[in-house]
């Protein structure tokens, strides 16, 4: 029997009986029994409640903690003025917080974070701060409770990718995003073309600036579809 370890990976080579004995020893030492998911909890500021049909994620607290960037009234009247180092730091902090929330449980926050990050590292003015505050305000109006139903492992599933993009005629680098869903596979029917399989399970999502230029709205959409297909 040979046991090799590289960083956080373990490779075990041996006879079937030796590997079975190794697995039994590991289970005897570290098995904590069958996990019971009947307790509500708070994780990274999000409240998680578990029920017989799945679990619910409430992210209202993390979103409510975010505050708009302070802007003096006189500066609001001059949106083309350059932002101060303190305002740039606040802008970066807001983008980072939104990106964290978005990656954890809120796809719309991912889009807002990506949109704000595009203005960081270049000459920015007060209008960027006003736009960031406006996007944050609209984001906080969205439903903050997300339900994740339990999947029946006896079903057959398919992965469905949804993509979208916005064309940027000035820079030619559009904003793109995609959602990856796990849906129960159903036999084709006349109604299948107009309905979405339910329940559906959101697996992954992303929103970012396109890495390639597009000369038209159609080109931006094709790049978005290609990105969704790659993932």
Q: How should these model regions be labeled?
A:
Residues 1-231:
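Long, low-complexity, charge-biased intrinsically disordered regions
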